[in-house]
Regions:
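Catalytic machinery of carbohydrate-active enzymes
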Residues: 1-260
Length: 260
């Protein structure tokens, strides 16, 4: 078992939006297991809103993995930054090659977690993720295998900031939505095409909900506009459209208004 108390810990994870949300139970459980630790989370810069206001994290570090930092020198520099941060424990949650390289470069007394096969020798223990588990449980399982016996958490959590709630409320007011109105949100995009449901099926569900007395709203980022337009074109009723109008933090705030 690794002693996490009073330690300076960095967690590294450079995967997609949904994957990052799925690590939030891990972060909550880590904080409960190590209430006196100083916890830093390294994430993709464009996704930082997912964890920026998380009360279980002390510091958020970012790297623009597909933008200005998409080169070996930047990854090496982040490894050096971690070294300079004088962390006691590094935990990597995914065998992503970028994270694994950064972590291999970094000099930290205890490096544990998942790793790309080329860098497994830098981790002790190197943990193979149990992909038979739900993804959120798979990340929690890393703590279990490090000796944490009580995994206290509240499921998936995103904490928007005050400005995020203000932007969301302005949108709902502009749409003429009263606080009493039932609202169901749709976030239909996916970076993986095989995970996408057919647009006409979303349209049919949205129409049914509208007939049941609910307002419907389509969320998503700018890259989801084409999918949303395809679904809306097949609807008989008219939904609200918030696609591409919110940052990640604002989206989380807006979604908190939905009953489903």
């Amino acid at each position: 078992m690794i002693d996490l108390s009073h330690k300076k810990i960095i967690v590294t994870f450079l995967m997609h939006l949904g994957d990052l949300v799925l690590t939030t139970p891990f972060i909550h459980a880590l904080r409960k297991a190590a209430p006196t630790a100083d916890i830093t989370y390294l994430v993709d810069e464009k996704l930082k809103d997912v964890v920026l206001h998380n009360p279980y994290i002390d510091h958020v570090w970012t790297i623009d993995k597909k933008g200005r930092d998409n080169h070996l020198r930047a990854l090496w520099a982040m490894g050096q930054k971690i070294t300079d941060g004088k962390f006691d424990v590094l935990i990597n949650l995914h065998p992503n090659e970028r994270c694994s390289f950064i972590d291999a470069v970094a000099r930290v007394p205890v490096k544990v977690g998942a790793s790309h096969f080329l860098f497994r020798g830098f981790f002790d223990p190197c943990i193979k993720l149990d992909r038979t588990l739900h993804a959120a449980d798979m990340y929690l399982d890393v703590l279990t295998r490090l000796g944490v016996t009580h995994l206290e958490h509240r499921g998936l959590e995103v904490f928007p900031g005050k400005a995020d709630y203000q932007k969301a409320e302005a949108f709902w007011q502009g749409a003429g939505l009263s606080p009493e109105t039932g609202l169901v949100g749709f976030n239909i995009g996916s970076a993986v095409e095989t995970k996408r449901w057919a647009p006409e099926r979303f349209a049919a569900v949205a129409d049914t909900l509208k007939e049941e007395g609910y307002e419907t709203v389509f969320f998503g980022g700018p890259m989801d506009r084409e999918m949303v337009e395809a679904a809306i074109s097949k609807m008989k009723t008219k939904p609200l459209v918030a696609t591409g109008k919110f940052s990640i933090g604002e989206l989380a705030a807006a979604m908190s208004r939905c009953q489903l």
